[in-house]
Curated annotation (Swiss-Prot):
GO terms for biological process: beta-glucan biosynthetic process. Probably involved in the control of the structural glucose backbone of osmoregulated periplasmic glucans (OPGs). Pathway: Glycan metabolism; osmoregulated periplasmic glucan (OPG) biosynthesis. It comes from the Bacteria. The keyword Iron-sulfur does not apply. One of its GO terms (molecular function) is carbohydrate binding. PANTHER family: GLUCANS BIOSYNTHESIS PROTEIN (PTHR30504), GLUCANS BIOSYNTHESIS PROTEIN D (PTHR30504:SF3). It comes from Xanthomonas axonopodis pv. citri (strain 306). This is Glucans biosynthesis protein D. Predicted to be exported by the Tat system. The position of the signal peptide cleavage has not been experimentally proven. It holds the Pfam family MdoG. It is found in: Periplasm. The gene is opgD.
Amino acid sequence: MQRRHFLKNAAAALAALGLPTLPQWALAAKAVGLRRLGQPQPFDYAWLKGQARELANAPYKSHKQLLPGPLEALNWDQYQSIRYRQDHALWADGNGKFQAKFFHLGLYFHTPVHIYDIVDGKAQQLAYDPAAFDYGRSGLGGKQLPKDLGFAGFRLNTRKDTDRDFSAFLGASYFRAVGKEGQYGQSARGLAIDTGTGGPEEFPDFIAYYLEQPADDSDTVVVYGLLDSPSVAGAYRFAITNGDVLLMDIDSALYPRKAIERLGIGPCTSMYQVGENDNRMDWDWRPEIHDTDGLAMWTGGGEWIWRPLCNPPHLRFNMFVDENPRGFGLLQRDRNFDHYQDDGVFYEKRPCLWVEPKSGWGKGSVQLVEIPTVDETFDNIVAFWNPQAKPQPGQELLMGYRLYWGAQPPASSPLAHCVATRTGLGGIVGQKRSHFSWRFAVDFAGGELAALAKDPKAKVEAVLQVSRGTTEIVSARPLHELKGYRAMFDLVPPDEGTQQIDIRLYLRANGKPLTETWLYQWTPPPPSERRIY
């Protein structure tokens, strides 16, 4: 599948969107009018893993289907007008804190998803019912649709706010969530396969979801997912706890059908078009356009790393080798509306997504893929964990991790952190330039920097390394407006070539690091385009 087409469609669609006197099964069906198929069957996670193992032992069969003509013909506005009726919401009749609603098939979503309700340890499939949907401007109101059509996915909301969902699962293995800001942004996926290899990328599908009815006083919704693709089948358990920072506690069991070249665990998918450090696509009236502005990593060795994102001229792939990482994620650190000026999509409210392994993941690497884009509806940034050992057929790969969605990740360094990266033409103001150089200004705040900025005797220095070229005009000076420091340097690229240059920077005093490590990758322009004005 063409990644650009798939991700543009998926991103846009996800952005839209007393004591009973009867047995609970009967009460739920009667109260919300949900039709059910078959009889309730015993269910647990071990059974679901068995189902995934059976899938992996059989040849893969595509789950996509040809939709009825009226659904195939829907345009974007028509599909967006279809809404699930509140009076048919799952668990709407009870006293619990949560409800679930379902997405209709159509437009880009051709893979039917079977959805089950779990009550008292037994699962029963929920039937598609045209009466459960308000078809709005879609033109489907009077059309007959198959009773076994199925759903495209689901969304969760609280009983106190039935109009705004806090999590949604829709399209392939994509899902999203929000923190207290209530603004969707980047997405997560169940699995990434062969992302950024240069060949076709594989997008596994969740083909079934099992939603466990929460206890009335529970703050957590438990969802199970069955995943399938040509390369792998898998079983997932999501424990979703809503809050200011939404937590997803995830267990997954993967069963490869064949060897996988590049397996991505805990994949985060985001968008970066233009920002302070990268204005290659700066024709828009808004100064910055991005869901996230950097990749943060807390390595197994305890180092904190910040890698600002870019919209590169060509596909860019980076791997950060590690062992037993403590966490990583795509973050939106810049929370200033004035830096975005978009009062429609509110980029300053987009959630960070932090991935925290629950146990040792062994050797591997955090991998970052950056893809050129001219369109903010295309998710062009992907970050994930890639195990060093390539999965083989017949193996069981068990991975447990937590996802945190919100304005701030749960873990933070005691050291100062990077708050801004800016770049531009180098040289000394007022003096004629004799050669081309590129200026980097990196701002740090937090930690001990506020106190050091007030101390005239403080000796703070920038520790700088580059893989190619030379550096000049290197400095580190207090930036009182931030109660921090600004590191500045000019990078002079080699005379020939446009090979990428890796940069590493941090601040220290008396031999002790004061900041997280700032990493960057810069592609110098061709010599013919190196204007010095």
